[in-house]
Regions:
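Proline-aspartate-enriched helix->loop->beta-strand connector
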Residues: 59-64
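Generic non-transmembrane alpha-helical segments
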Residues: 11, 115-127, 153, 170, ...
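A C-terminal functional module that forms or caps the active site or interfaces directly
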Residues: 141-193
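His/Asp/Glu-rich mid-to-C-terminal helical/loop segments that flank catalytic regions of hydrolases
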Residues: 188-219
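Mid-sequence, gly/pro-rich, charge-dense loop/helix-turn segments that line enzyme active sites
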Residues: 72-154
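N-terminal short beta-loop-beta anion/metal-coordinating cradle
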Residues: 1-58
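Alpha-helix C-terminal capping segments
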Residues: 53-57, 73-76, 168-177
Length: 219
């Protein structure tokens, strides 16, 4: 989303805008690290295309995805950050021969680098950081009924978004380490009023975006 990209671009020194096929990329530095930013867009296909173009053009050492997600646990608070340890789809069913959420021929879940997850958990960023399962699908989850349906398949899920697992699958196929940070914008089990989500952006959540900066600085 544009609001997320604006936050992250502000972290870059001497940013340069570059065009690769249909996507704009922003190259710059955070401390001594060369960083490339892009806005993939919403949904699994946009995320996968953006990831492929990033890998083809820049051959990154690792990919970090930053965005917002709905909280699947009532133990979370809005503006907490979930670091994905595993990723799967909540809207994929390929028959009884494979696990719900699993594409045939692919893992049931995609794992983040344990080293990257531990680095994220060690950050002293001033926000609550949690690690766990992120589930993804092309569905804006804004009802108790839908989140309960998802939790029926994935009771350990901490966050629900529309991109993380497709990026994880693409990185798995290309052999690129990956981790996703998701800032909790709303918690459907607590309140299904969509104003939670918009209030989150009104509050800007400046501190939460510092997780990404702190993470890069410690690589």
């Amino acid at each position: 989303m544009e609001k997320e990209l604006k936050q992250l671009k502000g972290l870059l020194s001497s940013p340069v805008t570059e065009k690769q096929h249909t996507k704009e990329f922003f190259r710059g530095k955070i401390d001594d690290h060369e960083v490339i930013l892009q806005q993939c867009g919403i949904g699994k296909v946009n995320a996968a295309i953006g990831t492929v173009e990033m890998i083809d053009a820049y051959h990154p050492d690792l990919i970090v995805s930053s965005g917002c997600a709905g909280g699947a646990s009532t133990q979370l608070k809005i503006t907490d950050v979930v670091v994905g340890t595993h990723y799967t789809y909540h809207d994929v069913y390929c028959g009884e021969e494979v696990t719900y959420g699993q594409m045939v021929g692919m893992p049931a879940q995609y794992e983040a680098s344990e080293k990257l997850v531990q680095q994220a958990l060690s950050l002293n960023s001033g926000v609550g950081i949690h690690a766990g399962l992120i589930v993804s699908g092309d569905w804006f989850v804004n009802s108790k009924e839908k989140i309960r349906e998802i939790l029926g398949h994935f009771p350990d899920a901490l966050a629900v978004d529309m991109e993380s697992c497709s990026i994880a699958q693409t990185c798995y196929l290309y052999g690129v380490p990956f981790v996703s940070f998701r800032i909790i914008s709303d918690i459907p089990l607590i309140d299904t009023d969509a104003s939670q989500y918009y209030d989150f952006w009104d509050r800007v959540a400046e501190g939460s975006f510092q997780v990404t900066r702190s993470f890069v600085e410690r690589l």
